[in-house]
Amino acid sequence: MREESWEDHDTIQLTAQRKYLAEVQALETLLTRELSVFLTEPGSKKTNIINRITGKTYALPSTELLRLYEHLEQCRKQGALMYFLERQGTYSGLMLDYDLKLNTNAAPPLEPPALSRLCHRIFVHIKNSSVLPEGSHKIHFFFTLKPEVVQGKYGFHVLIPGLKLAASTKKSIIGSLQHDATVQKILHEQGVANPESCLDPHSASVPSLLYGSSKLNHKPYQLKTGFELVFDSSDPDYIPIHQIKNIESYNLVSELSLTNEQGSLVRPVYCAADIAAEKEEEIPTEDHSLSILMLHDPEARYLHKILNLLPPEYYVEYPLWSNVVFALANTSANYRPLAEWFSQKCPEKWNTGGKEKLEQLWNDASRHTEKKITKRSIMYWAHKHAPQQYKEIVEQGYFSILAEYVYSYNGMLEHYMIAKVIYAMMGNKFVVDVDSNGKYVWFEFVLPGQPMNQGEIWKWRKEVNPDELHIYISENFSRVMDRITEHIKYHLSQPHETNILNYYKKLLKAFERSKSKIFNDSFKKGVIRQAEFLFRQRSFIQTLDTNPHLLGVGNGVLSIETIPAKLINHFHEHPIHQYTHICYVPFNPENPWTKLLLNALQDIIPELDARLWIMFYLSTAIFRGLKEALMLLWLGGGCNGKTFLMRLVAMVLGDHYASKLNISLLTSYRETAEKPNSAFMRLKGRGYGYFEETNKSEVLNTSRLKEMVNPGDVTARELNQKQESFQMTATMVAASNYNFIIDTTDHGTWRRLRHYRSKVKFCHNPDPNNSYEKKEDPRFIHEYIMDPNCQNAFFSILVYFWEKLQKEYNGQIKKVFCPTIESETEAYRKSQDTLHRFITERIVESPSAETVYNLSEVVTAYAEWYNANINVKRHIALELSQELENSVLEKYLQWSPNKTRILKGCRILHKFETLQPGESYIGVSTAGTLLNTPICEPKNKWWEWSPNPSAPPEKEASAPTP
């Protein structure tokens, strides 16, 4: 049978003894029903008794103290565990605490002759440090010893309960004893390695354990012997001493109490202090918050053990220490004592402002929830540094929790009890939250070695039913229950009294019935239902995938928050659920698949500036935060590669991050507020959306267009779902064989659009004299786009361009110089927006112009130009005025003194009139034909070039074919 640790023994035994020891039951009744009227506030000066089990403190009068001592003595004789302390008052007995380091692992003999010599030396210092009263007095010395040597350490207490001394006198006695050569010699003879420093200087005032009680996780000290010393002031040189006989016949809890004044053997002897009582310092009340926490919170005991596995750098180095503090604070506000204990493992830092730093960190953790490190990280660190010890502690922790239930409820286990242990076992791996439909939903953190779909590793996987927990209950949990069986049988094999053996027999019989339930399906379902409440982490679903810089990938989580991007392929606490199946590998232009794709991009988009701009734009699809308000309209007659490229982006990002959108979303009228729009909901949380293959002359709904492009919140709902609000985060591309019709003059809409027209066509038999005809390769559509190697390579290209955009353009697409797309966008706008065409052809910026035009004059000029060049129609002046105010002329319009709009700093040209010196057209110049724009490549590899208006690229050789 594997023995439980003493810590586990304490908690289990405390539970068991309440069942079979009538003395313990009587003690609890006394405390809860009769002595509760004497309860005090923690830290009260009136406190004289402290119950470490409950943390309660009492101010008991002498009569009630005697009753308590009687109950404690009966419990002690039955071997019950107790944790009671007495607070030393202004005048109380003397306790000397010796903490010994031994030369061997054998306990020192400490036989009566040596202890008698110690009594004499101690009394000499008592005489020298206090004023003993006149007359003859009996002074009793008791020696209690630590039950065993632990790693070369041992200890004993000297109790002189009848001699009532002031705290200052006790300190004086202890101070002089520390330098007593005779005492040091006696201890040295006993095999003590540290006789000069083994006496604890703080024993003069700290609360003292009542006899039979112990610190949590320690065995109580045992009485070795006692001596009676007789002192007569009339003959101070004659001090007889003899060993006390029949010492066990007395109530030892009462007799060894430092504050009791009504003992049968020990009578009080009051000594005058050498320092006035009014100058006495306060007697402290020891802080037992950590002990109480660990006694009542199994998880705290468990964490205490786990923290002990962390190497020194975790409490010495500030970054690691602060992470531990944050993890404890984020796990539970009650774990502050654990944080203090862990911080004190480095005394140098704790004593130089450590407490203040801890206070600040603890408060920061409650305010800054973005640093969501929890106990899961502590578990990971401990397992990393001490895997074998970690495994043993974890297994022991499960055993302790289950054992408490078994002993508390006489072996009968119900659903919640099993669920509680399962939570301790799997609480770091599973989380439950309630979804928008009010249903409990399970999530499992997927680790290597589990059955999984590609991409689920190191992420939170949604489970319809936690099948692993069902299996775990029957297979793994049964092993923990077997340990309980061993534990009970071990006690049955011990020489206990009949009533205790009968208790264990009944316990084993009931427990064996409970064990069989874990193989029952309906019972396990009940356990899972109860586990839902324990595993519940409120708002967990809302926190999933909220960091736009984190992308779930096939081999972990990719962080693009820093440059270069960082692959997280180990334990982490980022709440990531979504993912793409693509594995991230760093960009390598020498990779054959990367070369293939770089060449393909060069063929699809022949203009270098346009190719770079489009790749920068598409790279923003891996970021799911707010972006620049842009949409790319891509025109092409077919067989030009645009569909391949758009689909490849979508396939690489996967359905969680990308979506193909129905073109009706852009062309149809907006639905009414109460109606669902599943197509629009496809954009929620997506980083990329694309439209393709429209009919001829599709008219875009400009209000929907602006809503989709503008950054900010939108609302929509799925069928049979509630209305939701979400942010538009998608990088959007709309491709068509025909130009879209955009019937608006609103500059706010047009400035969000970019237009590119494909020039290249992939043919079966390309014309060798036409540089825009390329040899088609069906493998791109039918094979490469589905090949994981191709997809991985393209994803690395997207990440490369994202990093390049951040480094060189501060992440802003509008800073990327691209004359091709600018001129094509301008030409496209002119073909759609006649008002803009008029402005860019007939109105020029003229800083020296003295003419100021009323807005009505501009309206008239436009109407005349329209009727002469477009079509004769009736124009509504008010509508035209509003359109001009929202056009590219907006920045040139001013308010006149009479509150009318005027055009200033510009000149309206007459037909065939040319520019004057210093004048320039408004808008982008489109001089020259777009088809004749030279294809100009840089000497270096094209993907390395950074568009710069002041440095045109030089001719470059294309990337080599793999």
Curated annotation (Swiss-Prot):
ATP binds at G636, G637, G638, C639, N640, G641, K642, T643. It comes from the Viruses. Keywords: ATP-binding, DNA replication, Helicase, Hydrolase, Late protein, Nucleotide-binding. Coiled coil: none annotated. The keyword Repressor does not apply. Its EC number is 3.6.4.-. It is an enzyme of class 3 (hydrolase). Gene3D superfamilies: P-loop containing nucleotide triphosphate hydrolases. The keyword ATP-binding applies. SUPFAM superfamilies: P-loop containing nucleoside triphosphate hydrolases. Induction: Expressed in the late phase of the viral replicative cycle. One of its GO terms (biological process) is DNA replication. GO terms for molecular function: ATP binding; helicase activity; hydrolase activity, acting on acid anhydrides. Residues 607-775 form the SF3 helicase domain. Belongs to the asfivirus helicase C962R family. This is Putative primase C962R.
